[in-house]
Structure formats: C-alpha cells, structure tokens
C-alpha cells in the first residue's frame, strides 16, 4: 500500500516532466524544420 501511494505521488510529476520535454522537443524540431510535420506527399 505504501508503494502504491509513492507511485501515485511520483507518476504525475514524471509524466508532466516527460510531456513537457516531449512538447519542447517537438516545438524545436518544428522551428528548425517547419514543413516536417505537414504531410505533403
């Protein structure tokens, strides 16, 4: 039970950091390669 409470308190922090880093990475890629995210076939 104690491990579950530790996990529940750590998981939102880790997921917030992970999604923040992922969003920042996508923004930087989109800044340098603005046409990479559009599907131009």
From Swiss-Prot:
A Pfam family reported for this protein in Swiss-Prot or TrEMBL: PSI_PsaJ
Subcellular location: Plastid, Chloroplast thylakoid membrane
GO cellular component, one term: chloroplast thylakoid membrane
GO process terms (BP): photosynthesis
Transmembrane intervals: 7-27
Main location: plastid
Name of the protein described by the UniProt record: Photosystem I reaction center subunit IX
Species name: Jasminum nudiflorum (Winter jasmine)
Protein's gene: psaJ
